[in-house]
Amino acid sequence: SVTHVGTTAEQAFAMAAGVCQDHTHVFLALLRDKGIAARYVSGYIYEATQAYMASHAWAEVLLAGNWYTFDISNQHFTPNCHVYIAFGRDYADAAPVRGVRTGGGDERLYSQVMVSTSPQYIPQLNAQFAAQQ
């Protein structure tokens, strides 16, 4: 990728390139420029065909007192497939892993996430989301 966690919305927009984090930062910058409340969300997106997945980022926008999902990268606008980890102003607020390490030696971080649905709750979630519309 041509971007990294430190890439700003302005830089990603100028490059016309990036990943979900960059798409979300650009979208948030445009919304905030217009005075629209919005937040950065980090988590995972559930794909029935994939048992393991990478982290993902999307936005939520506050409209008429309700938060609405805007996954610009995947063009998803309902939260049915999103697994929330954290939300905040930007990646720095909602980084899925953050910390400080001191001392010598090598380090490695390995994580694995498995997500599956529970069919009994999907109709309830869909009804709850529809009621908020």
Describe each PLM feature range.
Residues 1-18, 26, 91, 102-130:
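Secondary-structure boundary elements
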Residues 22-105:
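Hydrophobic/aromatic-rich core segments of domains that either
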